[in-house]
Structure formats: C-alpha cells, structure tokens
C-alpha cells in the first residue's frame, strides 16, 4: 500500500507476512490510514512514521471504515462488524453481530450508525447507542457501493436499476421508513455510487457504461457520460460535488464537469 502527500515521494506500507491488502480507508480528521490483510487490521499515521497498530480479528476483514473523527475503525467480517479504537494498542473490539457475510462498511457522518453491505444483496446496520439492528433489503443484485449525502440525512446505494436512497433523519435512521429510488432504468443496473457527505448530490456509474449526476431535491439526471460501453468499475465525486471521475472495466477513464 503506497500513500503520498503533495510534492513528496510516496511511502510504502506493507501488510504482515506480505499478505494481499484487501480494503483501505483514510481519515483526514486524524491523519490515520487503515488497511486490512486477511484477519489483520493495520493502522498507520501519515504524520508519524513510527506509529503502527495491528489488530487481529477472528475472521477475514472485508472492509474498513473510520468514524467521522478518525478515532474508531469499523471492520466488516463474516458474522458482523468489529469496532476498534484506532490508537489503543491492547484492546478487545466491540462486536456488532448479524449472521451472514458482510462485505463493506461505513459510518454515518454523525457517528451514530454503522452500515454494512452484504453478500446476499442487502444492507445491515446498527444504531451504536444500543446496538439496535437495521435491515435494509429488497435489492435485485449485490450492493457494491454506499455513500452518505445531504449532511448525512440520506444514504445512497448501488445494487438496483436506480440509485436507492435511504433516509437517515432523526434517532431511528431508516427504521420504519421506505427507501426511494432515482434514475430507474429497467435495462441497466447502478454498479457504483459516489457522494460527498456535505453536499446534496450524487453520481452513479451504470453497468452499461453510462454515468449520471443528480440532485435528488431537483428534477432529472445529467448524463455526464451518455455513451454506452464497458461497465463502470470506479467512480468518485470531487470535494465540491461538481466534478465526476470515472473508469470502466476496460481501462477507459475520464473527469467531467457536472
């Protein structure tokens, strides 16, 4: 795993026993970088080359995600999610349990919820103050990407013919509420979504190679890449939410204004 700062050479960080690195996340708030290899969750500090923590999980780690302050890390595994404090060397994780294979993980921007993607085409979540379970299903395919927007009031996901939006308003999050869907197209699937938590917009990359940008509070979609082709394999939104970067499965890529 290589990380770099502007005008500086890249820095190499390796996994224990030279294992394949599976997942990665970084926290601008704490300058920490977390990555997983097998059952090991590793943490390094971008400002302190001597700092490193290696935490052992009971199962293989499939996804990692920092909380908003960069102090805790969620690690998705088979059977649920483990919560670790990023800097404490000797500790036991807090376990959030739910049967099944959890493939990715994210904190809500207010730090009150943790959401995982699952192998069996659904999401699961927990309200952290009481570990209350939240089930979010109904997807026709596996959810590969999630992202919060509108100050954390909405969670956008891939995995359907349109981008699925779950409400995260109030202390109950999506519990007892229905999801909505934008950009529905029967002939394609949303492969990826990209968001910026502070802004109320999102981008979606489709299985047929198209990319659109939208404001859910407005009307219509802006197809920033309208031509069809290989499925979109990577997608990102600029910090101001107004530029979209994409790449497809054949190595084509672009950056476009929304």
Language-model features, listed with the residues they occupy:
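WD40-repeat beta-propeller superdomains and closely related acidic/aromatic-rich repeat-like regions
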Residues: 1-258
